[in-house]
Curated annotation (Swiss-Prot):
Record EC number: 1.15.1.1
Upper lineage: Archaea, Methanobacteriati, Methanobacteriota, Stenosarchaea group, Halobacteria
Cofactor(s) in the UniProt record: Mn(2+)
InterPro entries listed in its UniProt record: Fe/Mn_Superoxide_Dismutase, Mn/Fe_SOD, Mn/Fe_SOD_BS, Mn/Fe_SOD_C, Mn/Fe_SOD_N, Mn/Fe_SOD_N_sf, SOD_C_sf, Superox_dis_Halo
Molecular function terms from GO: metal ion binding; superoxide dismutase activity
Reaction equation(s) it catalyzes: 2 superoxide + 2 H(+) = H2O2 + O2
Keywords tagged on the record: Manganese, Metal-binding, Oxidoreductase, Plasmid
Protein name: Superoxide dismutase [Mn] 1
Protein family (similarity comment): Belongs to the iron/manganese superoxide dismutase family.
Role this protein plays: Destroys superoxide anion radicals which are normally produced within the cells and which are toxic to biological systems.
Record bears the keyword Secreted: no
NCBIfam families: Superox_dis_Halo
Pfam families documented for this protein: Sod_Fe_C (PF02777), Sod_Fe_N (PF00081)
Length: 200
């Protein structure tokens, strides 16, 4: 059985200020993200024990917890990696070209992504859809509701209230704008290249 662990942030807790405060990053990473790691491990342990005992009364709940907490852990890892204090630029190279091809322009992609972020009850994601071989924005509620089967996440924005309420109150749009001041396209570009290698 895998034992999942919380990796350190790839920068200091105050590195994204003034856009995302040290307090929010500390709470978000050390408490919320850690909770998803703990929940995933606990669910896997329950499943392993049930298989060993041949008793499956609690397995359905544990399976749901694997999906919820596992997706939460994976998306948070991606979220931390696609921000940096050196961020704030637009994508370049192959990913920029593909965004323009699939959405018409970077501005059209960004407008649609911001709309997704405003509507989501969890995450706005830019994904590579391996079924149709194109980039898409998707609205994900919680961590696992609304995801598109066969899609490969490229860019993730967490819009759960714990991501922004301390800094921005109910003004989620201000937080989304702040995200674009720290978004670092190096990791999304690498994930896009990985998707192309896998699926095209």
């Amino acid at each position: 059985m895998s034992d999942y662990e919380l990796d350190p942030l790839p920068y200091e807790y105050d590195a994204l200020e003034p856009h995302i405060s040290e307090q929010v990053l500390t709470w978000h990473h050390d408490t919320h993200h850690q909770g998803y790691v703990n929940g995933w491990n606990a669910a896997e342990e329950t499943l392993a024990e049930n298989r060993e005992a041949g008793e499956f009364g609690s397995s359905a709940g544990a399976l749901r917890n694997v999906t919820h907490n596992g997706s939460g852990h994976i998306l948070h890892d991606l979220f931390w990696q696609n921000m940096s204090p050196e961020g704030g630029d637009e994508p370049e190279g192959a990913l920029a070209e593909r965004i323009a091809e699939d959405f018409g322009s970077y501005e059209a992609w960004k407008g649609e992504f911001e709309a997704a972020a405003g509507a989501a009850g969890g995450w706005a994601l830019l994904v590579y859809d391996s079924f149709s071989n194109q980039l898409r924005n998707v609205v994900v509620d919680k961590h696992d509701q609304g995801a598109l089967w066969g899609s490969h996440p490229i860019l993730a924005l967490d819009v759960w209230e714990h991501s922004y309420y301390h800094d921005y109150g109910p003004a989620r749009g201000d937080f989304v704008s702040a995200f674009f001041e720290v978004v670092d396209w190096d990791e999304p570009a690498a994930r896009y290249e990985q998707a192309v290698e896998l699926f095209e």
